[in-house]
Curated annotation (Swiss-Prot):
Family per record: Belongs to the phosphofructokinase type A (PFKA) family. ATP-dependent PFK group I subfamily. Eukaryotic two domain clade 'E' sub-subfamily.
Region described as N-terminal catalytic PFK domain 1: spans on this chain: 1-558
PROSITE patterns: PHOSPHOFRUCTOKINASE
Cellular compartment(s): Cytoplasm
Enzyme class: transferase
Record-listed E.C. numbers: 2.7.1.11
GO cellular component, one term: mitochondrion
Alphabetical list of NCBIfam families matching this protein: 6PF1K_euk
Record-given protein name: ATP-dependent 6-phosphofructokinase
Catalytic activity: beta-D-fructose 6-phosphate + ATP = beta-D-fructose 1,6-bisphosphate + ADP + H(+)
Organism field: Yarrowia lipolytica (strain CLIB 122 / E 150)
């Protein structure tokens, strides 16, 4: 059962421990091969301990695998093993450990369970007790023994990477198993319209393919390159795609090819693939490109037969290329593909639109003008809807929600006039290029301008055009492209002739595979439904998030300072307070909560400057929020009502007094881990203070993304975008000076989320997190890796490199210390510099993703208060509103606090994102780091050598 390369000697002077340890290792599958007792005729050899009362040697081995030998010694003077003072935390580094390879950890756990303490405190499963790849236990003699699915934890060989299918909440299990039959040649192409993130996708495909033992060929200029062949089809090496992660567009070119639509063109493409030995194709493009790819696969057998018949290829070549494997990745800024929540390029395009509309706002505000902004989206209004939400547009026109042909102008002018009457100086209307009315007549930007001119507004048209496609991809697109690229390779390697062509999708925050043909067919159904005036069906075919976002936009847009548009049964008084460090999206959440509350007839109050502000300033810290003051907040960073790290424990009695005095019916707390703690303190105080027995809901907002009960927090995406821009500039500088490494310190507290994801999207060569820690052996391993990498890239471009270190990954190995050690060890072969972005990571303007999420969070929070107001079941009245996949979930704070939180580390016990680090390492070629080893390990080894005890190497 166990494989390894170690020889270990364990000593004790207690006979019961010796006997129980013997049973322990026998249960693991070790067999006694040698036994020695003092006083028998047998004489101890040099290998055997002369001072032993009894020795038993146990060995476990398999054919072709080096044996593992454990020598148990009963001695008059056994070693005293280090005690473990606190078994509630990760105690692996407190004593020396011996780690074995064990492919079946469930069997190992079952075998050693009878030897554990009743509370299982001597067992540690990592990274979690449900999904573990390492298992540590304390044997009866007090030795720490580990078991790992990794074949050799101390080896420098690259461990098998995790599949991208493992990335996603509640989906962290075994890596996707692929069957590689021979060395496969895989072609990759980009086709149709370009999209930001395509280069990152190609990079991931190339490097994942090489890591999986494949050869990857670029088919340049899309299907045109496939038809023409020659130099347009060429192999890509690992180094060829260096630096592509941050580039916009596609460096392998794209084109729309009429020839490929005809069979003769596809026949030429088949011939060129056979000539180059390519038997699989990954196509990155829109629905038209993917449709062509699947047709190509469907016709492949007949194309090969025709090529044999006309003598273009031999029968032997035909036999080697009997089947063609196709995999699709959707690259489209419109986000118009069914069965996936988002497509590569959509987030970046949305970011461009929102940035430009933010700029337009300044001039519109100055001149009190109206602007009509036309964005892309021929059959899909995703860009227009999300941009309208993120920028606080007055009105939007999208194809799926076509307005009445005779009333749309009147409805729009009514909304615009209402907003102007409430004091708003600017008007922004966003029009999708495919916008139509209920009679399928186009609604153009010019038509909207004419209507606005008719009510006396000075109106301008801004058509954004191809600016929406340009620029580097944002953080979300880099993550999506990288994970989907890895999954595309795995999909290709696991396909059979009977398997339908897959399309790589994102569903519920999981990378998934969907049937390509069905996905394209559903996409076309949306256009058909719109063409048939069945707009309800068109909306049904969109994902639920799209529908919910549209409803949220309409509700917040209908807010009126004087008259509620959708009055609730019971008007409520709702308080909003921010706690902890500022994060992008806080203001957007405040805005959406207030606008939704006003639309429902509620009174919305801000508690300024957190809990300490309420205690110190009393009624002066509480102020009712108006429509006009919150309306422009969606674009602003920071926190307009003030925030700090004070908690209710500063004076619970005074806080309860003011809650009672203000007659609050509900509370929304926006913030990070401090908000979580604040809610727990308020929840615990309910029994003493009746004024606190109201519905309370927490909206997670922190760049650390460390709030239990949610996969995402507001501000994390803004932080990642800030880091992407910062690190891209650093890499440019490092590349210009050639052999330079920047050691970048990132925030995140005790959560490695930001460092891990930033490592993936910036192409960092090394990432250190609090979860993995830093030690001398690991640092030595990584410095050696960096030296080798720089040596191989001394004369090439784009050689700038990054090392990311979370601010709390080590108290000893600080950013400056690591930089100094690297410079000393590099001996002038390269140099290292320190870069600390600090609070720049909190970002300026929040990202569109954080703005859009903020609206959904805020509306759900107010709805929770509406639903639970007046209920007597206080147990479920205090919750964290979290995102699981793409769905929102309310979770009791008391449950999270008691069962799901590492309080000392201020983070959840389980997180979905850990496997991203393995994929990031694979994509930069970082070899598997050694297991952590403390200085105590080195001391123990030296003592063992002096005593003649053979210690595992």
């Amino acid at each position: 059962m166990i494989e390894g390369i170690s020889f270990a000697s364990f000593v004790t002077h207690e006979k019961p421990k010796f006997v129980r340890a013997l049973d322990f290792y026998k249960a693991l599958g070790f067999l006694p091969t040698k036994e020695y007792k003092h006083g028998t005729d047998h004489h101890a050899t040099d290998e055997e301990g002369a001072g032993s009362i009894q020795e038993v040697w146990l060995t476990s081995s398999r054919a072709g695998v080096p044996s593992v030998t454990v020598k148990l010694r009963l001695s008059r003077h056994g070693n005293e093993h280090v005690s473990l003072p606190n078994l509630k935390h990760d105690w692996r580094s407190l004593v020396p450990s011996l780690v074995y390879y064990a492919p079946d950890l469930d069997a190992v756990r079952a075998a050693i369970t009878p030897f554990l303490h009743e509370d299982h405190s001597t067992l540690l499963e990592r990274p979690s007790h449900t999904n573990f790849i390492e298992l540590y236990a304390i044997d009866p003699m007090g030795n720490l023994v580990g078991f790992s699915r990794r074949e050799n934890p101390y080896s420098s060989a690259m461990q098998k990477p995790f599949s991208a299918d493992d990335i996603g909440p509640q989906n962290f299990s075994k890596p996707n198993e692929t069957k590689i039959k021979g060395k496969k040649r895989i072609g990759v192409m980009t086709s149709g319209g370009d999209a930001p993130g395509m280069c990152a996708a190609v990079r991931a495909v190339v490097r994942a393919g090489i890591a999986r033992g494949c050869e990857v060929y670029a088919v340049r200029e899309g299907y045109e390159g496939l038809v023409k062949g020659g130099d347009l089809i060429e192999p890509l090496s690992w180094e060829d795609v260096r630096g592509w992660l941050s580039l916009g567009g596609t460096l392998i070119g794209t084109a729309r090819c009429k020839e490929f639509r005809e069979r003769e063109g596809r026949l030429a493409g088949a011939l060129n693939m056979v000539k180059n030995g390519i038997d699989a194709l990954i196509v990155i493009g829109g629905d038209g490109s993917l449709t062509g790819a699947d047709l190509f696969r469907e016709e492949w057998p007949s194309l090969i037969e025709e090529l044999v018949t006309n003598g273009s290829i031999t029968a032997e070549q035909a036999e080697r290329h009997r089947h063609l494997d196709i995999c699709g990745m959707v690259g489209s800024i419109d986000n118009d593909m069914a069965t996936t929540d988002v497509t590569i390029g959509a987030y970046s395009s949305l970011d461009r639109i929102c940035e430009l509309v933010d700029f337009i706002d300044a001039t519109a505000q100055s001149h009190s003008r109206a602007f009509v902004v036309e964005v892309m989206g021929r059959h899909c209004g995703w860009l227009a809807l999300m941009a309208g939400t993120a920028t606080g547009a007055d009105y939007i026109f999208i194809p799926e929600a076509a307005p009445d042909a005779t009333q749309w102008a009147e409805k729009m002018t009514r909304v615009v006039k209402r907003h102007r009457s409430q004091g708003k100086r600017k008007t922004v209307v966003i029009v999708a290029e495919g916008a139509i009315d209920s009679d399928l007549n186009p609604i153009t930007a010019k038509m909207v301008k004419d209507v606005l001119d008719g009510i006396g507004l000075d109106t301008r048209i801004s058509t954004l055009g191809h600016v929406q496609r340009g620029g580097p991809p944002v953080a979300a697109d880099r993550v999506l492209a990288s994970l989907q690229g890895v999954e595309a390779i795995d999909a290709i390697l696991s396909l059979t002739p009977e398997t339908p062509s897959p399309m790589i999708a994102l569903n519920e925050n999981k990378i998934t595979r969907k049937p390509l043909v069905e996905s394209v067919a559903l996409t076309k159904k949306v256009a058909d439904a719109i063409g048939n005036k069945d707009f309800a069906e068109a909306m049904r075919l969109r994902n639920p998030e799209f529908v919910e976002q549209l409803q949220g936009f309409l509700l917040t847009n209908s807010a009126d300072k004087d008259r509620p548009q959708e009055p609730a049964k019971d008007p409520l008084r709702v308080a909003i307070v921010c706690t902890g460090a500022p994060a992008g999206g806080m203001n957007a959440a405040i805005r959406s909560a207030v606008l939704y509350g006003l639309a429902r007839g509620h009174q919305m109050f801000a508690i300024h400057n957190g809990w300490s502000g309420l205690v110190k300033n009393g009624d002066d810290a509480v102020r009712e929020l108006t429509w006009l003051e919150v309306e422009p907040l969606c674009q602003k960073g920071g926190c307009e009502i003030g925030t700090n790290r004070s908690l209710p424990e500063c004076d619970l009695g005074m806080i309860a007094y003011h809650f009672q005095r203000q007659r609050f019916d509900g509370l929304i707390v926006i913030g990070g881990f401090e908000a979580f703690r604040a809610l727990n303190q308020l929840d615990d105080a309910r029994h003493a203070y009746p004024a606190l027995r109201i519905p309370m809901v927490g909206i997670p907002a922190t760049i650390s993304n460390n709030v239990p009960g949610t996969d995402y927090s507001l501000g994390a995406d803004t932080c990642l975008n800030s880091l992407v821009q910062y690190c891209d500039v650093l890499k440019t500088s490092a590349s210009a000076t050639r052999l330079r490494l920047f050691v970048v310190e990132v925030q995140g507290g005790n959560s490695g989320y930001i460092a891990t994801v930033a490592g993936l999207i910036t192409g960092a060569y090394v990432v250190y997190t609090p979860e993995s820690g830093i030690n001398l052996r690991l640092l030595q391993h990584d410095i050696s890796y960096l030296k080798d990498t720089f040596a191989h890239q001394a004369d090439v471009n784009r050689t700038g490199k990054l090392l990311l270190r979370n601010e709390r990954s080590s108290n000893v190995f600080t950013t400056d210390v690591i930089t100094g050690i690297i410079n000393e060890e590099a001996k002038g072969s390269f140099d290292a510099r320190t870069a600390i972005p600090g609070h720049v990571q909190q970002g300026g303007h929040p990202s569109p993703t954080d703005r859009v999420r903020a609206q959904r969070f805020a509306i759900k929070a107010v709805q929770f208060i509406e639903e639970h107001h007046g209920s007597k079941n206080n147990a479920d009245h205090c919750v964290i509103l979290g995102v699981r996949g793409s769905k929102f979930k309310y979770t009791s704070v008391s449950h999270l606090y008691a069962h799901k939180t590492e309080h000392g580390a201020r983070r959840p016990k389980h997180s979905y994102w850990h496997a991203i680090g393995d994929i990031a390492n694979m994509l930069v070629g970082r070899k598997a780091p050694p297991l952590p080893e403390t200085l105590n390990d080195e001391i123990e080894k030296n003592i063992a050598k002096e005593q003649g005890i053979i210690d595992p190497c």
